[in-house]
């Protein structure tokens, strides 16, 4: 018999028929439609009827419907929803710090994860400007006249966010020569005043850094040992440079050394730190700065790994807030040029003045890189201290309940 020997069932194999899409055997259709039995459904849970009908075009109410006003409203509403989520995360983190739950180091992971979430949201908000920029200046001008006197400066949630993170009130740029709170009335003004009186994230982080293990003068005494090591290291560096033959290169190295010496030794001048603090050029207390630098230097130690992640997240948030302000400035400049804003401000010129270190909260963390030193200058740990930094601290033998930790 000629032909393919594999045809038929010559080898005694049993071939199973594969299920055909749409047949009774299609597993993709074996679920149960529970919504058909009543109860909470998607639209009701999210209150979509309210959310999706909250776009009232002012141009349309004035009888001149402008297409791009819808995009303008949607984008700003999305911003406000994300601001609400950021405030939700920020308030929860502040509560953990305020209630002392952060003393149980197991809660630090929760703090870090929530602050990281805030930074991821801010990344999205920075990118969101690109959607608004699909609208041209002429498109915006078509409906801009209908917006006055509404202004982005009147965003209550953004001002609350600034206050709760820790933007210093005396560092704010006046808005038309008036206090920023003068633009808010009634309950909104009271909420802002209350947020100014509450503990900020900056203050809570500062108190936490002041408790950094290893700062104790009668313990590891990190600061005392660091000063001693830096002083000795600078002396050795100066001797090395002086041993070189006279040359232009040597003169440059001596000049560079003197600058480095001045910067590093300024670390141990507490009066200078207090002076810079009073001017607003530094934000953290002297002891908190010591704690931050210790975490920075020993970030690879198990006990400092999560705290270092928190410091990194705080810097990310500060950077992203600055990027958000900068992108906002660029967009306003593109849309308005140098015209006044709809709320009466100087527009681009006012916004440009807010893109500076005046509005940075954790500027001291960025400046830690100023004090980088060779690794062999960092104080070595004895076995006892090294073991200590392998041990986390906790308040009791069990995790907090959801009521306490949420």
UniProtKB/Swiss-Prot annotation:
Chain positions recorded as substrate binding sites: 72-76, 144, 342
GO terms, biological process: L-tryptophan catabolic process to acetyl-CoA; L-tryptophan catabolic process to kynurenine; protein homotetramerization; response to nitroglycerin
Cofactor note: Binds 1 heme group per subunit.
Name of one Pfam family that matches: Trp_dioxygenase
Disulfide-linked positions: none
Gene Ontology CC terms: cytosol
EC number(s) given by UniProt: 1.13.11.11
Effect of residue 140 to A: Reduces enzyme activity by 99%
InterPro entries in the record: Trp/Indoleamine_2_3_dOase-like, Trp_2_3_dOase
Pathway(s) where this gene product acts: Amino-acid degradation; L-tryptophan degradation via kynurenine pathway; L-kynurenine from L-tryptophan: step 1/2
Reactions that this protein is recorded to catalyse: L-tryptophan + O2 = N-formyl-L-kynurenine
Annotated consequence of substituting residue 151 to A: Reduces enzyme activity by 90%
UniProt cofactor(s): heme
Alphabetized GO MF terms: amino acid binding; heme binding; identical protein binding; metal ion binding; oxygen binding; tryptophan 2,3-dioxygenase activity
Gene3D superfamilies assigned: 1.10.287.3810, 1.20.58.480
Residues at which heme binds: 328
Phenotype upon changing residue 42 to A: Reduces enzyme activity by 99%
Keywords: Dioxygenase, Disease variant, Heme, Iron, Metal-binding, Oxidoreductase, Tryptophan catabolism
Enzyme class: oxidoreductase
Subunit note: Homotetramer. Dimer of dimers.
Stated role: Heme-dependent dioxygenase that catalyzes the oxidative cleavage of the L-tryptophan (L-Trp) pyrrole ring and converts L-tryptophan to N-formyl-L-kynurenine. Catalyzes the oxidative cleavage of the indole moiety.
Disease: Hypertryptophanemia: An autosomal recessive condition characterized by persistent hypertryptophanemia and hyperserotoninemia.
Family (UniProt): Belongs to the tryptophan 2,3-dioxygenase family.
Name used for this protein in its record: Tryptophan 2,3-dioxygenase
Species whose genome carries this gene: Homo sapiens
């Amino acid at each position: 018999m000629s032909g393919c020997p594999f045809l038929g069932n010559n080898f005694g194999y049993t071939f199973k028929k594969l299920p055909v899409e749409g047949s009774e055997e299609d597993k993709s259709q074996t679920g149960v439609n529970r919504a058909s039995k009543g109860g909470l459904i998607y639209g009701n849970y999210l209150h979509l009827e309210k959310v999706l009908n909250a776009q009232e075009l002012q141009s349309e109410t004035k009888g001149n419907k402008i297409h791009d006003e819808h995009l303008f409203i949607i984008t700003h509403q999305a911003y406000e929803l994300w601001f609400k989520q950021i405030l939700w995360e920020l308030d929860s983190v502040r509560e953990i710090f305020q209630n002392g739950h952060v003393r149980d180091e197991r809660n630090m992971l929760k703090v870090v994860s929530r602050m990281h979430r805030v930074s991821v949201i801010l990344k999205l908000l920075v990118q969101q400007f690109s959607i608004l920029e699909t609208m041209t200046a002429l498109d915006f001008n078509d409906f801009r006249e209908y917006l006055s006197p509404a202004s982005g400066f009147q965003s209550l949630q953004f001002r609350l966010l600034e206050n709760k993170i820790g933007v210093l009130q005396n560092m704010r740029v006046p808005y038309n020569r008036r206090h920023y709170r003068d633009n808010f009335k009634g309950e909104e003004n009271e909420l802002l005043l209350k947020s100014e009186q509450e503990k900020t994230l900056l203050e809570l982080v500062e108190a936490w850094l002041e408790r950094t293990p290893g700062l104790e003068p009668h313990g590891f005494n990190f600061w005392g040992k660091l000063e001693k090591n830096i002083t000795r290291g600078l002396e050795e560096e100066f001797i090395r440079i002086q041993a070189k033959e006279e040359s232009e290169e040597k003169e440059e190295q001596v000049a560079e050394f003197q600058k480095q010496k001045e910067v590093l030794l300024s670390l141990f001048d507490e009066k200078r730190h207090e002076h810079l603090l009073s001017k607003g050029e530094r934000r953290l207390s002297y002891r908190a700065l010591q704690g931050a630098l210790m975490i920075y230097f020993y970030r690879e130690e198990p006990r400092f790994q999560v705290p270092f992640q928190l410091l990194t997240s705080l810097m990310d948030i500060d950077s992203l807030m600055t990027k958000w302000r900068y992108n906002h400035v660029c967009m306003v400049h593109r849309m308005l040029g140098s015209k006044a804003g709809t709320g009466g401000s100087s527009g681009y010129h006012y916004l440009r003045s807010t893109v500076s270190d005046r509005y940075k909260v954790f500027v001291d963390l960025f400046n830690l890189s100023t004090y980088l030193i060779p690794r062999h200058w960092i104080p070595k740990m004895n076995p006892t201290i090294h073991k200590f930094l392998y041990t986390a601290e906790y308040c009791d033998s069990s995790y907090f309940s959801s009521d306490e930790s949420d």
